[in-house]
């Protein structure tokens, strides 16, 4: 399992630990990933995604998974999230036409 957020693309960063004596040692900054189940209102289904805590806050702030994915750019999303986004856009377009 890769350490990348499925919704924002947040991944592992590298840097240095810097001591008081200014000694530098390599380290990794890992994203705060959580396995969560999010509900799509348009599709009436639950989806299990691996997202960062910041992405989870963004989903809540935008009003749910559907609103977040519609506003998100496709190049940040994982392949699963892109497919889900296309399905949501298609379903909302059908609902608007009906």
UniProtKB/Swiss-Prot annotation:
The keyword Cytoplasm does not apply. GO terms for molecular function: structural constituent of ribosome. Signal peptide: none annotated. Pfam families: Ribosomal_L28 (PF00830). One of its GO terms (biological process) is translation. Keywords: Ribonucleoprotein, Ribosomal protein. GO terms for cellular component: cytosolic large ribosomal subunit. SUPFAM superfamilies: L28p-like. It comes from the Bacteria. PANTHER family: 39S RIBOSOMAL PROTEIN L28, MITOCHONDRIAL, LARGE RIBOSOMAL SUBUNIT PROTEIN BL28M. Belongs to the bacterial ribosomal protein bL28 family. This is Large ribosomal subunit protein bL28.
């Amino acid at each position: 399992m890769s350490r990348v957020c499925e919704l924002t693309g947040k991944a592992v960063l590298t840097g240095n630990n810097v001591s008081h004596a200014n000694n530098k040692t390599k380290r990794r900054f890992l994203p705060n990933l959580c396995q969560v189940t999010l509900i799509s209102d348009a599709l009436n289904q639950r989806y299990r995604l691996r997202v960062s805590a910041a992405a989870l806050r963004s989903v809540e702030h935008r009003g749910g998974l559907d609103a977040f994915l519609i506003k998100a750019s496709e190049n940040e999303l994982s392949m699963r999230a892109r497919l889900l986004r296309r399905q949501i856009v298609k379903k909302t377009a059908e609902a608007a036409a009906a």
